[in-house]
């Protein structure tokens, strides 16, 4: 959304993109938090448990949910839009990343359990880290290594040679793994630091 006007005006370029990207992501997270607060506010009416809300997104949506988890972990002022003390029960990202103006991601505390899918040949969203013009885009591989160091629960399914197809393929092909993550690491809060290497259409092995 934040890139539409500069694009239409012909002002989007490799030079301006790093300055525009953080604000664009901020707008997306603001929408995510507004939607989350709306759902949490309807919890009694809809019969849901706000403590079990999972954020899930693909590509730009995956960047949004990961950024949302990163902001919560770091007590970003934007989290004031959320109910007091709120955190997601889990986060599922299909080819996502976190954007930060720093040279590295810094987590004040561990985030909610995170499930990551990404191909290492993705040219749309960086698999590792890309720094450009003062902005850093930190992909799934980079995030998974940090979560491992923090001993924060995560599941990373990495596919060698795969492109941005991992933004969509897992929704249909890896449902068993997703269900297992939701059951064990989100529902039962079991510890887990799992990294799997696989083929694009290969079902992850049961744990």
Predicted regions and their residues:
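The feature captures the conserved acid-bearing segment of alpha/beta-hydrolase catalytic domains
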Residues: 79-151
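Short, solvent-exposed loop/turn and secondary-structure capping segments
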Residues: 4, 66-68, 103-105, 126-129, ...
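Soluble non-cytosolic domains of exported or imported proteins
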Residues: 22-30, 134-138, 169-172
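Serine-hydrolase catalytic machinery in alpha/beta-hydrolase-like enzymes
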Residues: 1-48
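C-terminal catalytic histidine-bearing segment of alpha/beta-hydrolase fold enzymes
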Residues: 145-207
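Solvent-exposed, polar/charged alpha-helical surfaces in well-ordered, non-transmembrane soluble domains
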Residues: 30-37, 41, 141, 145, ...
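Solvent-exposed loop/turn segments at secondary-structure junctions
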Residues: 1, 60-63, 96-100, 121-124, ...
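Primarily recognizes the serine-hydrolase "nucleophile elbow" in alpha/beta-hydrolase
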Residues: 30, 34-110
């Amino acid at each position: 959304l934040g890139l539409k006007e500069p694009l239409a005006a012909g002002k989007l370029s490799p030079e301006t993109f790093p300055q525009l990207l953080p604000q664009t992501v901020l707008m997306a997270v603001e929408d995510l938090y507004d939607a989350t607060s709306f759902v949490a506010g309807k919890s009694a009416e809809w019969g849901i448990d706000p403590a079990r809300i999972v954020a899930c997104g693909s590509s730009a949506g995956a960047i949004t949910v990961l950024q949302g988890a990163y902001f919560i972990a770091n007590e970003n002022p934007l989290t004031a839009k959320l109910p007091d003390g709120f955190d997601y029960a889990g986060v599922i990202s299909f080819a996502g990343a976190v954007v930060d103006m720093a040279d590295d991601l810094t987590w004040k505390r561990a985030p909610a359990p995170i499930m990551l899918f990404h191909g290492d040949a993705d040219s749309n969203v960086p698999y590792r880290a890309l720094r450009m013009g003062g902005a850093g885009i930190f992909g799934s591989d980079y995030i998974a290594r940090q979560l491992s160091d923090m001993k924060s629960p995560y599941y990373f399914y990495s596919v060698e040679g795969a492109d941005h197809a991992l933004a969509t393929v897992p929704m249909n092909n890896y449902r068993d793994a997703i269900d297992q993550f939701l059951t064990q690491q989100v529902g039962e809060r079991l510890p887990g630091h799992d990294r799997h290497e696989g083929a694009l259409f290969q079902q992850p092995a049961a744990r």
